[in-house]
């Protein structure tokens, strides 16, 4: 069995899960946690930068998650950063700090990728086949049009709850 850690670094919180995947592709949730780190705190149109304090909160949390992954004998880590890092002028340098401090390589995903991942995460939990999916995050909202359980169109708008 492989153990996979998944990290979703959002504008307001970090989600962390560990799953075990069998040879048959069946997965089991081993661990999950969500921490509010307020990464986008202090960002604005006039100051599109992640603050040092927000970066440090995120890095401290990610160090804990890296340790938990090691304790749980994780074989692969998938880590993504969303709207706050995507729009921050210092987003790339922040991810270099994350990699150096916590040894977690992260990928900045586009709004379209974020919408696709949100769709993939919920499609098997919804009984209806045609709907609009709204995924409200801290710094963006992804909206997907779904017909016949297929994502036909999606848009990411840089307006969030924070």
Write out the residue ranges for each language-model feature:
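Nucleotide/phosphate-binding catalytic cleft detector across ATP-hydrolyzing
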Residues: 1-9, 17-133, 144-162
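Conserved Rossmann-like nucleotide-cofactor binding loop
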Residues: 12-14, 139
